[in-house]
From Swiss-Prot:
The lineage of its organism: Eukaryota, Metazoa, Ecdysozoa, Arthropoda, Hexapoda. Expressed in the CNS and the ring gland but not in midgut, thoracic perisympathetic organs (tPSO) or abdominal perisympathetic organs (aPSO) (at protein level). This is Neuropeptide Y-amide. Keywords: Amidation, Neuropeptide. It comes from Delia radicum. GO terms for biological process: neuropeptide signaling pathway. The modification Tyrosine amide is found at residue 8.
Length: 8
């Protein structure tokens, strides 16, 4: 699960 500020 991506954290805030991480986009994949």
């Amino acid at each position: 699960l991506p954290s805030i500020g991480h986009y994949y």
